[in-house]
Structures are given as C-alpha cells and as structure tokens.
Amino acid sequence: MLGIADMQPRQLAAQVLNFALVLSTAFMMWKGLSAASDSPSPIVVVLSGSMEPAFQRGDLLFLWNRGADTQVGEIVVYNVKGKDIPIVHRVVRRYGGGKTPLRLLTKGDNNLADDTELYAAGQSFLNRQEDVIGSVVGFIPFVGYVTILLSEHPWLKQVMLGMMGVMVVLQRE
C-alpha cells in the first residue's frame, strides 16, 4: 500500500478533490433539506431524557416547518434566545393564532413543570414564527448517539476526521 508521499501530484490532487466533493455533497444535502423543510436545522438529536418515553437520548429527529399552525400535543423543537442548544418538547397550550401571533407553551413529557423557566428572561411563551425551528415528523432511534459521544469526548472528533481523511486519500479508483 502506498503512502501519501509515494503518490503522484496529480493523483494526490484527485484524492483531495474527491474528499472536497464528499464534504460539499454533504453540505448541499443539508442545505437542500433545510430549504425543503423550511427549517434551519431539519435534523436534530435528542440530548436529554426530558421527552422520555416518547424519545430517548440519542434519537435522531426529522423536522418540518411548513405549517404555521401548531396544535396542542404536537412535538416541536425550539431555540431560546441567547442559547444555542435546541430544545425538543411538547406543546401543552396555545394562545392566539389567525390575525394575532401564535404563542405556545411547551413542556417535556418527563418534566414536572412547563418550560417557562427555560424561556428567555421576560418570556412566558414561545412565538411560533420566531422561536420554533420545526415540528417533529419522524425519528430514528439512537442513531444520533454518535453526535452525543463526539460532543462529550472532543478527541473522538479528531480521530474520526483523521480516519476519514486517510481513507479518502488512500482510496484507489
């Protein structure tokens, strides 16, 4: 097996371009899903046990944000102003709608209280248009656990990226 130093410049350039193609394809697929679902994050991972038994930690959720009307009982993913981790919880109450902005109150299935303590300071409900990323339309159990492992053990990220890079560069066509 030849190493990187033994490769011809043209062959090395082809492998680097192949690696760039893989990365750009993944990025384009993400952006395509974002546009189709009208959500900046069309796929999210459940990070806590607050939605058990409906969703477990590590479940991969698919979001859809095309419908502006959200019903009580629907599971939504929302962002809190000033925090960058999305929260997955169920709508327990809704206010307004029609000509007035739709406001939502959410709660985790495994939590005792609603989410008013989680919302931004001075906020007692979610604005459907501004805060909600999307509604959950499907999920794959435990597939997202890799994301949790990578965030809890950052060194795994470097190992994984290094292995992927070496595999692409050493791949023969």
UniProtKB/Swiss-Prot annotation:
Ranges annotated as spanning the membrane: 16-36
Residue ranges, annotated region (C-terminal short (CTS) helix): 159-170
Molecular function terms, GO-annotated: serine-type endopeptidase activity
Q: Which domain of life is it from?
A: Eukaryota
Keyword Nucleotide-binding in annotation: no
Q: Which GO terms describe its cellular component?
A: signal peptidase complex
Q: Which InterPro entries match?
A: LexA/Signal_pep-like_sf, Pept_S26A_signal_pept_1_Ser-AS, Peptidase_S26, Peptidase_S26B
According to the UniProt entry, the coiled-coil residues are none
| Cytoplasmic topological segments | 1-15
Q: How does it sit in the membrane?
A: Single-pass type II membrane protein
- Can you tell me which family this protein belongs to? Belongs to the peptidase S26B family.
**By what name is this protein known?**
Signal peptidase complex catalytic subunit sec11
What organism is recorded for this protein?
A: Pyrenophora teres f. teres (strain 0-1) (Barley net blotch fungus)
Q: Report the gene name.
A: sec11
